[in-house]
Swiss-Prot record:
The gene is pgi. It is found in: Cytoplasm. Its EC number is 5.3.1.9. Catalyzes the reversible isomerization of glucose-6-phosphate to fructose-6-phosphate. It is an enzyme of class 5 (isomerase). It comes from Acaryochloris marina (strain MBIC 11017). GO terms for cellular component: cytosol. It holds the Pfam family PGI. This is Glucose-6-phosphate isomerase. Belongs to the GPI family.
Length: 529
């Protein structure tokens, strides 16, 4: 395509949101008009399904649940007055709690104000809050925000050690809808133990963000925690950033949460339009479908040219992959759908994997996230008339052109600046794009059976470990690995048995291994003490 035709294509397919100042450019996706025409009937269906979802239809049939994250930024959309009131009341509670903490009306026993917050959660209870925290971080936040997002003991120690000297002025926000998520429960118990060891009253520092009547809600009530803020059962983890899950840590940090909600609402209105070319989320879904032939055949590379948006790709990994990565479609047919997502930031990635993107296997499409405003501070020129930001913009434009020369497809999403409103809009844009794409490929975007299978396997492993320890405790002589597996009634899981005892031995849990580590089948196991 010559330069004049390419310029015309850019103008023909450019979307611009006047209120938000956001552009979506899909002109470098190499579809033609015939492809768009073929897909239009699918979009008619997708738009109708999205309307039904917003109206309160059961959009998650596997769990028989409504899907209501869009109501969070416009409570007038809620299908019942009770739900509308619940949304409004929850937001008011979040704002009041944060205001009381900032003003010192809610304070620690030994100081006039809290200084830090540890947010404990995993998956959607952490990825969104971390992305927003980094994207909108201010130099002097109302409270310093830290995250425990795994059950890694060393990682937990790292966070707790960092705030050790300020633990007496630290809030702990535990985020879990059920209260039974092992990683989150473990993080909470580890934090609770650290407070206890320092003679601090944990409940006077503890906040729960959880579902009504959950295990965590019961603990918070029984122990007298500072606050319990609700998670709604009609909001899934990966679409929960604009619920209490994301708004509580953001508000405590001092981020303008009403602006985030306003940005999301404005984008929701734009992505509700039943016209492909004037709906930015539909343009993204169209591009994803074209790139992967509706079967996820190409990976989605997310490349934000802004340090503050670096975690956006990690956030999108869950939103896209957990929503779309499904074995079966809504008709119960095996389809193995999904889109793999990865990325970091530009121009850093130009010195990492962009070499392969330009000259290697063309198994991807790329999304550039561009931010027009360089900085808030005084402009500095690294060369006469040239700033660091000019270089950043030049690297983005140059990489986009270099990829196009090699027929590598790309999308560009442009923000005027990184503000609370823009971040809220960006989240809403991709939430809607995922929902529309899910309709195009006929999958349930709002359940995660694969995650549940992994949780069950982990629970089974812990049960097997307890059984192994009990067997060793009742056995006076060392046991061969094979005999131990037989006694545990797990001969088909002998490798798991071996790895359990190896882990226990490495952590000095009383288990000792005898034999050649390079020949696991020769090892003998015993329990000392």
């Amino acid at each position: 395509m010559d330069a004049a035709a390419l310029w015309q294509r850019y103008q023909d397919w450019l979307y611009y949101h006047e209120q938000l100042g956001i552009y979506v450019d899909i002109s470098r996706m190499s579809f033609d008009d015939a492809f768009v025409e073929r897909l239009e009937p699918k979009f008619v269906k997708a738009f109708k399904e999205m309307d039904a979802l917003e109206a309160g239809a059961i959009a998650n049939p596997d769990e028989n649940r409504m899907v209501g994250h869009y109501w969070l930024r416009d409570s007038n959309l809620a299908p019942t007055p009770e739900l509308k009131k619940e949304i409004i009341t929850t937001l008011e509670k979040i704002e009041a709690f944060a205001a009381d903490v900032h003003a010192g009306r809610i304070k620690p026993a030994t100081a006039p104000r809290f200084t830090d917050v540890i947010s404990i959660g995993i998956g959607g209870s952490s990825l969104g809050p971390q992305f927003v925290s980094q994207a909108l971080a201010v130099l002097h936040p109302a409270l310093e925000l830290h995250f425990i997002d795994n059950t890694d003991p060393a990682g937990i120690d790292y966070i707790l050690d960092r705030v050790q000297d300020r633990l007496d002025t630290t809030l702990v926000v535990t985020i879990s809808k059920s209260g039974g998520t092992p990683e989150t429960r473990n993080g909470m118990l580890e934090a609770k133990n650290r407070f206890k060891n320092l003679g601090l009253d944990f409940p006077k520092h503890a906040v729960a963000v959880t579902g009504y009547g959950s295990k965590l809600a019961q603990i918070a009530e029984e122990e007298g925690w500072l606050a319990m803020l609700p998670m709604h059962d009609w909001v899934g983890g990966r679409t929960s950033e604009l619920s209490a899950v994301g708004l509580v840590p953001a508000s405590l940090q001092g981020i303008a949460i009403r602006e985030m909600l306003a940005g999301a609402k404005a984008m929701d209105e734009a992505t509700r339009v039943h016209d492909l070319k004037t709906n930015p989320a539909a343009l993204l879904a169209l591009s994803w479908y074209f790139a992967g032939e509706g079967a996820g055949k190409k990976d989605m590379v997310i490349l934000p040219y802004k340090d503050s948006l670096m975690l956006f790709s990690r956030y999108l990994q869950q939103l896209v992959m957990e929503s779309l990565g499904k074995e079966k479609d809504l008709d119960d047919k095996i389809v193995h759908q999904g889109i793999a997502v990865y990325g970091n930031k530009g121009s850093t990635d130009q010195h990492a994997y962009v070499q392969e993107l330009r000259e290697g296997i063309p198994n991807f499409f790329l999304t550039f996230i561009e931010v027009l405003k360089d900085r808030d501070g005084t402009r500095f020129e690294v060369e006469p008339g040239v700033t660091s930001g000019d270089y950043l913009s030049g690297f983005l434009l140059g990489t986009r052109e270099a990829l196009y020369e090699k027929r590598r497809d790309s999308i560009t999403v442009t923000l005027p600046e990184v503000t609370s409103k823009q971040v809220g809009a960006l989240i809403a844009l991709y939430e809607r794009a995922v929902g529309l794409y899910a309709s195009l490929i006929n999958v349930n975007a709002y359940h995660q059976p694969g995650v549940e299978a992994g949780k069950k396997a982990a629970t089974d492993t812990i049960a097997l470990q307890n059984k192994i320890v009990q067997i060793l405790r009742n056995t006076l002589t060392p046991l061969p690995i094979t005999s131990l597996a037989d006694k545990a009634e797990a001969p088909d899981k002998i490798e798991t048995v071996y790895k359990i005892v190896r882990h226990l031995a490495a952590n000095k849990r009383g288990v000792e291994l005898y034999g050649n580590p390079a020949e696991p089948g020769s090892l003998q196991v015993t329990l000392k003490g």
